[in-house]
């Protein structure tokens, strides 16, 4: 049996992986897939890839493009979620903010530098017409850290996936002022180059297997109830999320890659332009 290490966020997007593991789908192909949840998100997962502490990661597109641009020895091996991610823009419920425009020149909570919450703060600032050089950040590690930072006033707002934070909005911990969708497919599968060079056939089996699961995922009977129970979400929220989410079984296109890279260049988040073939496997 070939052991493969994989990391991802503990969110509903990744249920297909857990179902495939639980049902022995990878083991049927001679693969033991060792999944680790990373609640800190993309910045932490990029570091794990760079340090050879994981073989694969289910990671935000913009985050891994930035990380590879900065020398991370990894490659994008496939799209995973082809639809955009809906980033909610949240404040503590007791704060005075009423609109996103009021957040100009305030401090954003981010899980870490290079994370989705960090990069999307720039995308949102550009969308709002703010001076991105004046953005301020407070590193909070994870969602629990964001709750504490916003409550104590060490940060003013926090961007995180809309439906993951919905229970905190419903319970009155956060207020959502708006949403900012990513302008590209949100999640990709990335592989450490050391693993990739030695295990191309193993990787192909992993991709074939997960693609079967994601292709059929929405047609699984009562999958909405399974998701709602497993991730402690309201059924109507899961139904809305499922209607907005499309899993992908294809490689990231050069056009999409260039769009992500150009946005990062325009925001001065990467310094140099890289070739598609240097970053995307195929």
Question: Model segments located where?
Answer:
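Pocket-lining segment of extracytoplasmic ligand-binding domains
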Residues: 138, 144-227
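Proline/Glycine/Serine-rich low-complexity intrinsically disordered segments
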Residues: 94-99, 126, 132, 193, ...
